[in-house]
């Protein structure tokens, strides 16, 4: 089966709308991947200037270092965009970003010596940031993604050691 038959099959099974779930540990470059994917495949397919600017504004932030940047699952762009995968295969794509599973040494989830408590749409009460991140990541993997893409790292993109990522990668896979 050549690759375009695979794409045609996915299009038929999903009614032409693909949700690409980008998952993995925190601080691996998930949001950076989404921004780059959008730069190469989504933004060039938008002809309406206003829609293109809105879509740029919807892209996630990214940065170097150990601080967790993403704080909740996010669908990017807000509205699916048509992308040609071959001469005769066109699908509508949205990416789904998530916080990811916690990695030892990452920062941003602890404040004044205790784990931050956050409000989520899943509970009526506050829960620990790490728990919310895990639930959101699971929801992206199990409930939203048509295709899942696991992002890992060798540790060179942050100041975190490679071995710190392994438990979170195992949870993801």
Please place each PLM-identified region on the residue numbering.
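Conserved catalytic-core segment of NTP-binding enzymes
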Residues: 131-173
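Conserved G1/Walker A P-loop phosphate-binding module
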Residues: 1-129, 139-151
């Amino acid at each position: 089966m050549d690759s375009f038959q695979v794409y045609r099959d996915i299009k038929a099974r999903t009614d032409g709308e693909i949700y690409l779930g980008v998952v993995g540990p925190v601080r691996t470059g998930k949001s950076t991947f989404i921004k780059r994917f959008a730069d190469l495949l989504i933004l060039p397919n938008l002809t309406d200037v206003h829609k293109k600017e809105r879509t740029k504004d919807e892209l996630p932030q990214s940065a170097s270092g150990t601080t967790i940047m993403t704080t909740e699952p996010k669908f990017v762009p807000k509205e699916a965009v048509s992308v040609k995968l071959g001469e005769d295969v066109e699908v509508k794509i949205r990416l789904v970003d998530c916080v990811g599973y916690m990695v030892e040494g990452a920062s941003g989830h602890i404040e004044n010596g205790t784990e931050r408590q956050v409000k989520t749409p899943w509970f009526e009460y506050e829960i620990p940031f790490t728990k919310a991140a895990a639930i959101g990541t699971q929801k992206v993997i199990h409930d939203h993604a048509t295709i899942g893409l696991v992002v890992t790292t060798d540790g060179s993109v942050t100041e975190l050691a490679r071995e710190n990522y392994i438990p979170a990668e195992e949870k993801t896979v």
